[in-house]
């Protein structure tokens, strides 16, 4: 099993999208990319922790590739808006790929460049590509948020 971590705005919808993928054995939401240890939702929403709302997925690379996960990441949000997804504004909602090794970094950069060249977005893609750091699992009420409430997705 492998692990991948993505930030693409509010983590509820991103988690729901990844949970639908064959080969993903688990997905959990949390906070990463900042400097405060063991942050909570209120801390992260203050905008003073450096953390992003993120989804950490565990997946079987024999069933689903990292490149396929990158494709889904791009589909779940607008990567051209800086620190914003829909009505959610703040650095915690930034678009970011957290890589764990040089292969993931290269794949993420190539995927970003390919999407930029595709012309799908008229504006520059502002997604960060940065080394993975400590992932702090979010409070239980955030886990499987949509599933627990019978909601299928959010609107960006």
Segments and roles (model prediction):
Residues 1-156:
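Flexible coil/turn and secondary-structure edge motifs
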């Amino acid at each position: 099993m492998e692990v991948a971590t993505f930030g693409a705005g509010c983590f509820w919808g991103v988690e729901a999208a990844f949970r639908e993928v064959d080969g993903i054995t688990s997905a959990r939401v949390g906070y990463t990319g900042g400097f405060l240890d063991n942050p909570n939702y209120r801390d992260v929403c203050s905008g003073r922790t450096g953390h992003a709302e993120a989804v950490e997925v565990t997946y079987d690379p024999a069933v689903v590739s990292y490149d396929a996960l990158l494709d889904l990441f791009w589909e779940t949000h607008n990567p051209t808006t800086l620190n914003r997804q829909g009505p959610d504004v703040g650095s915690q909602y930034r678009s970011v790929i957290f890589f764990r090794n040089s292969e993931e970094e290269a794949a993420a950069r190539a995927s970003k460049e390919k999407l930029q060249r595709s012309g799908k977005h008229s504006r520059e893609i502002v997604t960060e590509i940065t080394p993975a750091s400590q992932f702090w699992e979010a409070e239980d009420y955030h886990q499987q948020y949509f599933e627990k409430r019978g909601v299928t997705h959010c609107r960006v």
